[in-house]
């Protein structure tokens, strides 16, 4: 049986058991009905839920040990973050997953936590698939023999249905993705997140903290409008105790396939990602040039790096993947052999 939004007892029941029953929507700056500040924060004053939240049981989340045990067979957990939307974060996630999975000895999972804007299934050409429940838990959708995906998209009755949820429901589904999905033994679990620093990010960090996260890869474009939000993302990671594996500058230029001349489409008005990484004291993983065929490959669910291995973007991506593998303690030559990388 496949869980869906038409079957709330299957899809959402377990995730919402511990949450107190509220009588009104949470205010804008609600600390969360399950947080230590529930019913005590400034935003709680005058809220109809204040007494309910204040009297709700507090303490360690009993699901955390279950999540830790469930994920104990996953060697590396990598978050992909961006401050600004539209910088190619989900595209980079799909490329990173495909690159890791290009080694037949590696098994890779992708968890799409962009609840309101899931795009990973489209990029992986599994948009019409559904997930199924077995005795072991929810089964992810397998793109290939060694690449699996889990996304809210698989639970939508119709592809274009909007997910209009507040924080607690999003948090509950993310918890269920971590607690109930039978990932099995993975070498890499890559977590794609929505832009910014929202409920989804806080939930992923709190649920994964005990099981160990290798770190986060931040994605930006060269212009200051994007870098401005990346600085906030860096601050979030530091406050949340998330190791920053490095910064990737996406769409850094366009290399003409005829003359190989590089043009700056998004000019780095303040120095771009490289200077930001140096100023903020984080690793710079590299610059990936713009290639219109990346978007086309994502639309058709194709593996861009396999189809266009000679593209400057593919070459740059391979270098980034090798650097990330080194950051998490793996031998780059085993992850992406030198014969396949430039």
Swiss-Prot record:
PROSITE patterns: MRP. GO terms for molecular function: 4 iron, 4 sulfur cluster binding; ATP binding; ATP-dependent FeS chaperone activity; metal ion binding. Binds 4 [4Fe-4S] clusters per heterotetramer. Contains two stable clusters in the N-termini of NBP35 and two labile, bridging clusters between subunits of the NBP35-CFD1 heterotetramer. Its cofactor is [4Fe-4S] cluster. It is found in: Cytoplasm. [4Fe-4S] cluster 2 binds at residues 256, 259. Gene3D superfamilies: P-loop containing nucleotide triphosphate hydrolases (3.40.50.300). It holds the Pfam family ParA. The keyword DNA repair does not apply. ATP binds at residues 83-90. CDD domains: Mrp_NBP35 (cd02037). GO terms for cellular component: cytosol. [4Fe-4S] cluster 1 binds at residues 30, 44, 47, 53. It comes from the Eukaryota. Residues 16-42 are annotated as: Disordered. PANTHER family: CYTOSOLIC FE-S CLUSTER ASSEMBLY FACTOR NUBP1, NUCLEOTIDE-BINDING PROTEIN NBP35 YEAST -RELATED. Heterotetramer of 2 NBP35 and 2 CFD1 chains. Belongs to the Mrp/NBP35 ATP-binding proteins family. NUBP1/NBP35 subfamily. Component of the cytosolic iron-sulfur (Fe/S) protein assembly (CIA) machinery. Required for maturation of extramitochondrial Fe-S proteins. The NBP35-CFD1 heterotetramer forms a Fe-S scaffold complex, mediating the de novo assembly of an Fe-S cluster and its transfer to target apoproteins. HAMAP family: Mrp_NBP35 (MF_02040), NUBP1 (MF_03038). This is Cytosolic Fe-S cluster assembly factor NBP35. It comes from Coccidioides immitis (strain RS). The gene is NBP35.
């Amino acid at each position: 049986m496949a869980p869906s939004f038409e079957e709330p007892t299957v899809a959402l029941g377990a995730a919402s058991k511990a949450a107190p029953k509220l009588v009104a929507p949470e205010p804008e700056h609600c600390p969360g009905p399950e947080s230590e500040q529930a019913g005590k924060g400034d935003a709680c004053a005058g809220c109809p839920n204040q007494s309910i939240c204040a009297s709700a049981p507090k303490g360690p989340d009993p699901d955390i040990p279950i999540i830790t045990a469930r994920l104990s067979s996953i060697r590396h957990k990598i978050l992909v973050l961006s401050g600004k939307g539209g910088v190619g974060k989900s595209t980079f996630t799909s490329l990173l997953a495909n690159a890791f999975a290009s080694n037949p000895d590696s098994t890779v999972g992708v968890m799409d936590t962009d609840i309101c804007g899931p795009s990973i299934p489209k990029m992986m050409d599994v948009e019409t698939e559904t997930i199924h429940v077995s005795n072991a838990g929810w089964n992810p959708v397998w793109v290939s023999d060694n690449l699996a995906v889990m996304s809210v998209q698989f639970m939508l009755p119709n592809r274009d249905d909007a997910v209009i949820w507040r924080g607690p429901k999003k948090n509950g589904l993310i918890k269920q993705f971590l607690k109930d999905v039978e990932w099995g033994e993975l070498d890499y679990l890559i977590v794609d997140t929505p832009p910014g620093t929202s409920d989804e990010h806080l939930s992923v960090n709190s649920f994964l903290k005990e099981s160990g996260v290798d770190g986060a890869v931040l994605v930006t474009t060269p212009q200051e409008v994007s870098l401005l939000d990346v600085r906030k993302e860096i601050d979030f990671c530091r406050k949340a105790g998330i190791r920053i594996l490095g910064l990737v500058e996406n769409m850094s230029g366009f290399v003409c396939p005829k003359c190989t001349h590089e043009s700056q489409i998004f000019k780095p008005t303040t120095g771009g990602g490289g200077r930001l990484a140096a100023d903020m004291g984080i690793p710079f993983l590299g610059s990936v040039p713009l290639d219109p065929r990346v978007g086309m490959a994502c639309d058709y669910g194709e593996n861009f790096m396999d189809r266009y291995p000679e593209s400057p973007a593919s070459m740059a991506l391979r270098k980034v993947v090798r650097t990330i593998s080194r950051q998490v303690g793996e031998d780059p030559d085993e992850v992406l052999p030198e014969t396949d990388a430039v």
